Design a protein with these regions (language model features):
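Conserved catalytic submotifs in the C-terminal HATPase_c
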Residues: 46-49, 68, 73-83
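Short beta-strand/loop element within the Bergerat-fold HATPase_c
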Residues: 109-121
Length: 197
């Protein structure tokens, strides 16, 4: 096929698809580098007291355009008064990956809820969605690197977002757990001990 035969709409579609693929590859390389550095202990987690509500609003802002485009809702629930000793950039990266995962596995009209609360010795952050849910066979494998479910052929992904989130959360002495019901949605719960403050 000669270049002159291409319709402008075909060229634009090809350019858009190429750009999406390049973004996906760049994200893969960046995530691989981050995980490798975390594994090697070459990343210094610089912790400061950070306001959780401010962090969650930043995450909401980061995904607001995508959520609008996909006609999905991002909902925040939690008090303005909770702070956590953490590396804001790294923890935001971890929660970003979880929210992105929720957006990837929800449909038009679905909602993603980010909630946070404080207990006597921990801060808890949850990301809930009412999407397709995680198949029971996959639930114990979702934090493994490069794991791709045979049940999620309709969504692209490399299988690094959730393992990276887990590594970052563990670098903050936190724990992440996932619970899901097929066809009803998933809940990712992160707990960070605060008793050592």
């Amino acid at each position: 096929m000669q270049e002159d035969d291409l319709e402008p709409s075909s060229v634009k579609e090809f350019a858009d698809l190429s750009e999406q693929e390049l973004d996906r590859i760049e994200s893969l390389v960046q995530n691989l580098l981050k995980i490798t550095k975390l594994d090697a202990g070459s990343i210094v987690i610089e912790k400061h007291m950070e306001n959780i509500a401010d962090m969650m609003r930043d995450i909401e802002l980061h995904f607001a355009y995508r959520a609008r485009q996909e006609q999905k809702e991002l909902l925040l629930t939690g008090p303005d008064s909770i702070s956590l000793l953490c590396d804001r950039d790294w923890l935001t990266e971890a929660i970003d990956n979880i929210v992105k995962n929720a957006l990837d596995h929800t449909e038009k009209g679905d909602a993603i809820r980010i909630e946070w609360k404080s207990f006597s010795s921990a801060v808890q952050i949850t990301v809930k969605d009412n999407g397709c849910g995680i198949h029971p066979e996959d639930l114990h494998h979702i934090f493994k690197r490069f794991y791709r479910s045979r049940f999620s052929k309709d969504t692209q992904g490399i299988g690094l977002g959730l393992p990276l989130a887990k590594a970052i959360i563990e670098a903050h002495n936190g724990v992440i757990e996932a619970d899901s019901e097929l066809g009803k949605g998933s809940v990712f719960t992160m707990n960070f001990l605060t008793s050592d403050l």
